[in-house]
Amino acid sequence: MNFKIPQFPDFEISITAFENVTNSESIRSKVATLPYAFLDARMIYSQEQLYAALYRVLVEQNYNKLRTKTIHSEIMLCLSPTSNIGDAFKKFGIKEDSSTVICLHIKDRSDEPELPSLSSIVEGQEISLSKEFINQHRDIGMVGHVYKINGEMIENSTEDQVSSMIVNMIQLRGL
């Protein structure tokens, strides 16, 4: 899935999902050298959560406020409800046991035109990122724990309400 956000026409965003990934450990060992953000799909509750983090990254990039070394590592920090960079990488980044992965790339006009192909990096089945994919692979317990949304709140809320809680935490962190 490739798209642009109207407020940031100089950036093109690419999101690719993989399942049945068999080389997570290998990807994790070289993640710092790759021009992608590799997320553990279990930690993504909704597409809105991803979009909120991406929007925040682009705002911070626009105002030169990135706190990490790259725009791709900033994605993980922006997903986090806290400002701890290491904690964000541990919770949202690819893990050694990740079998479902979401790969993001933010390209601006200064990027090199040729990127390493994701199919040469990820050993797994590429599939379309959809609501169904996210619903199938998310771990509500892990997501609830990270965002401090208890099981009762999740059970008594609609899916959209839980997604809104997460998006609000992403947007309000640090204010």
From Swiss-Prot:
Subunit structure and binding partners: Component of the EKC/KEOPS complex composed of at least BUD32, CGI121, GON7, KAE1 and PCC1; the whole complex dimerizes.
Species this protein is from: Candida glabrata (strain ATCC 2001 / BCRC 20586 / JCM 3761 / NBRC 0622 / NRRL Y-65 / CBS 138)
Main location: nucleus
SUPFAM superfamilies to which the protein is assigned, alphabetical: PF0523-like
Domain of life (superkingdom): Eukaryota
Official protein name in the record: EKC/KEOPS complex subunit CGI121
Gene: CGI121
GO terms under biological process: positive regulation of transcription by RNA polymerase II; telomere maintenance via recombination; tRNA threonylcarbamoyladenosine modification
Gene3D superfamilies documented for this protein: CGI121/TPRKB
GO cellular component: chromosome, telomeric region; cytosol; EKC/KEOPS complex; nucleus
Subcellular location(s) of the protein: Nucleus; Chromosome, Telomere
InterPro entries associated with the record: CGI121/TPRKB (IPR013926), CGI121/TPRKB_sf (IPR036504)
